[in-house]
Amino acid sequence: MDKVYKRSWFQTFLAFLVSQLYFNFVELTGWGPKYREMNGFPANIVELDFFQTYLSFYDNPWFNIITVFLGVFTIIQIITGITKDIRN
């Protein structure tokens, strides 16, 4: 049996955690890059009531969108990776 840290789903999970640490560091210190205003489709997503109520983790809307996208991707990767591990 392989080590857990060598599995792809675990590496994806670590990448998600590192991104969250970066986002928190930037939010707390204000040392992050300046972002443009949102227009078009991303702005429509951020302005949804559901998104503002339940998925607003940071003050920066770009961080919120990236967090939701990476979170969904990470969950899918973990589920598929663990099911492959169980089958083997």
Swiss-Prot record:
One annotated Gene Ontology cellular component of this protein: plasma membrane
Membrane topology category: Multi-pass membrane protein
Pfam families: YfzA (PF14118)
Entry keywords, A to Z: Cell membrane, Membrane, Transmembrane, Transmembrane helix
Subcellular localization, as worded in the UniProt entry: Cell membrane
Ranges that cross the membrane: 13-33, 62-82
Protein name: Uncharacterized membrane protein YfzA
Organism: Bacillus subtilis (strain 168)
Lineage of origin: Bacteria, Bacillati, Bacillota, Bacilli, Bacillales
